[in-house]
């Protein structure tokens, strides 16, 4: 049974997903179907947690929209994800950044920036 699960996950795995860690600011283009039309909707926010592994991996992205905090749990292997770009790499000392929920204003999205070495 375990081999069957691994086989199914290997065939359905998304390979072009960038490395994302809590604290990173990401922009995700999601396919939204409204009636017969299909359009792309951008969701940009801070990754406050990642959970699971393999085909069950999800990330929780939080943004502030018109003064209201909005969180979205996004499955990494979802066919509705068109593209994912990392806008900024954040430096977090925790695996889960749930303390950002209690903050208001600019402090709600403030995470130190991680300096990345350029890869050649």
Curated annotation (Swiss-Prot):
It comes from the Bacteria. GO terms for molecular function: structural constituent of ribosome. GO terms for cellular component: cytosolic large ribosomal subunit. The keyword Ribosomal protein applies. Gene3D superfamilies: 2.30.30.790. Coiled coil: none annotated. Belongs to the bacterial ribosomal protein bL19 family. This is Large ribosomal subunit protein bL19. It comes from Pelodictyon phaeoclathratiforme (strain DSM 5477 / BU-1). The lineage of its organism: Bacteria, Pseudomonadati, Chlorobiota, Chlorobiia, Chlorobiales.
């Amino acid at each position: 049974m375990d081999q069957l699960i691994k086989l199914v996950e290997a065939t359905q795995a998304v390979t072009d997903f960038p490395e994302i860690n809590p604290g990173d600011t990401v922009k995700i283009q999601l396919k939204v179907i409204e009636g017969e039309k299909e359009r792309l909707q951008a969701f940009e926010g801070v990754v406050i947690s990642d959970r699971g592994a393999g085909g069950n991996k999800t990330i929780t992205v939080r943004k502030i929209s018109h003064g209201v905090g909005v969180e979205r749990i996004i499955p990494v292997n979802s066919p509705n994800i068109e593209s994912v770009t990392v806008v900024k790499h954040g430096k977090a000392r925790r695996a889960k950044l749930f303390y950002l929920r209690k903050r208001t204003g600019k402090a709600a999205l403030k995470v130190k920036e991680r300096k990345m070495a350029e890869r050649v």
